[in-house]
Swiss-Prot record:
NCBIfam families: adk. The keyword Acyltransferase does not apply. The lineage of its organism: Eukaryota, Sar, Alveolata, Apicomplexa, Aconoidasida. Catalyzes the reversible transfer of the terminal phosphate group between GTP and AMP. Has very low activity with UTP, ITP, CTP and IMP and no activity with ATP, GMP, CMP and UMP in vitro. InterPro entries: Adenyl_kin_sub, Adenylat/UMP-CMP_kin, Adenylat_kinase_CS, P-loop_NTPase. Optimum pH is 6. A ribonucleoside 5'-triphosphate binds at residues 10-15. This is GTP:AMP phosphotransferase. Belongs to the adenylate kinase family. It is an enzyme of class 2 (transferase). GO terms for biological process: nucleobase-containing compound metabolic process. Keywords: Iron, Kinase, Mitochondrion, Nucleotide-binding, Transferase, Transit peptide. It comes from Plasmodium falciparum (isolate 3D7).
Length: 229
């Protein structure tokens, strides 16, 4: 199973991908985490990426494509049943390169209104031990009910005892810049895959991670439909 998740920064696609990857034994290719690991290692790639992130811009197409291609090759040597792409493709050029690289079974566009996204992004945190993503925001507005996502004592690395770190690029000015860039890039991408009649499904969130069962039903229904063909 080869899945691509779309969604603006902070929508929660990484969390959904992580849960789905474990449930279905799929490799979670999280481009953002890969880049952050390179920064942490202070590699040449990491230094290049860090300069771009600090300015609030996006990393070059060629670098992203090479990273994704290498990750896909590594999957062939492991016992995964497929992969979930999270954070790729980011523009039309990357979309067309993806189609050349492999066949995708399902695209899912996870979305939230912009004002809710900003609140979520301002509350985003990273564990300084296990590097997992969490969120301290408690959003109770209109039909949205999204409590905080905090570390669990069941984590084998941090046991829930950790200092949560705020990303340097999670301030309101950079957040708005990134959302503007995302909307500019992704509206054409999503329309492209819809027009080309790929399997693309829109999935609106209301309760955050508690919407996962409905999200998972998309995959279940896809499999049922494929068996009927």
């Amino acid at each position: 199973m080869r899945i691509v998740l779309f969604g603006a920064p902070g929508v929660g696609k990484g969390t959904f991908a992580e849960i789905l990857s474990k449930k279905e034994n799929l490799k979670h290719i999280n481009v953002g985490n890969i880049l952050r690991n390179e920064i942490k290692k202070e590699s040449n790639i990491g230094k290049e990426v860090q300069n771009v992130v600090r300015s609030g811009n996006l990393v070059s197409d060629s670098l992203i494509i090479n990273i994704v291609h290498d990750e896909m090759k590594n999957i062939l040597n492991k016992k995964y049943k497929g992969f979930i792409l999270d954070g790729f493709p980011r523009n039309m050029y990357q979309s067309k390169e993806l189609i050349k690289m492999t066949n995708i079974d399902l695209f899912v566009n996870i979305y939230l209104p912009r004002n809710i996204l900003i609140k979520k992004l301002l509350g985003r945190r990273i564990c300084n031990i296990c590097d997992k993503n969490f969120n301290v925001s408690n959003i109770q507005q209109d039909s949205f009910d999204m409590p905080p996502i905090l570390p669990s004592k069941d984590c084998i690395q941090c046991n829930g005892h950790t200092n949560l770190i705020k990303r340097k690029d999670d301030n309101e000015d950079i957040i708005n810049h990134r959302l503007n860039s995302y909307e500019s890039d992704y509206i054409p991408i999503i329309q492209f895959f819809k027009n080309e009649k790929y399997n693309l499904i829109d999935f609106p969130l209301r309760r955050g991670i508690r919407d996962f069962d409905d999200f998972y039903s998309i995959l279940v229904n896809y499999r049922k439909n494929e068996k009927l063909k």
